């Protein structure tokens, strides 16, 4: 792989990238879901103590977290408790791995946005990769008006 941090520092210093765009090859697809301690509908923080915690794993899966059973989640700091990342040979494979991971992940004692991520993974535009900066606003609009 490439050292992206090194490349970002080079660009910030006004230097060119150490490789050309033509030298880049796409090798699969990756996704990341940020798991937050918040209500999946209202986005209100959900502080408390994690009573039970299980993180997923397996090929093409990475989880970065500080969370564990007995961990106290404060209302005074960032609500992110984990990042779940998946990689697959294709977008459908990466999405399938992410779905499996989110379904396997257990966080009891607080609410999380895992149900929201699962709904996003099912959305036809997300599945097809038809995304833009307005996706979430459109995705959440039916809830704001009392719909789906």
Give residue ranges: language-model regions.
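ATP-dependent carboxylate activation and anion-phosphoryl transfer catalytic cores
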Residues: 1-148
């Amino acid at each position: 792989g490439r050292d992206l941090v090194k490349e970002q520092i080079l660009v910030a210093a006004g230097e060119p990238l150490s490789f050309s765009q033509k030298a880049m090859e796409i090798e699969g697809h990756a996704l990341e879901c940020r798991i937050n301690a918040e209500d999946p509908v209202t986005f209100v923080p959900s502080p408390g103590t994690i009573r039970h915690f299980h993180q997923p794993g397996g090929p093409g899966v990475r989880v970065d977290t500080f969370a564990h059973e007995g961990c106290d989640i404060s209302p005074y700091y960032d609500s992110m408790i984990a990042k779940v990342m998946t990689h697959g040979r294709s977008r459908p494979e990466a999405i399938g791995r992410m779905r499996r991971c989110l379904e396997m992940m257990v966080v009891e004692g607080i609410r999380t946005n895992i149900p929201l991520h699962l709904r996003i993974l099912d959305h036809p535009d997300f599945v097809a990769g038809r995304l833009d900066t307005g996706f979430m606003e459109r995705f959440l609009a039916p809830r704001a008006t009392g719909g789906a």
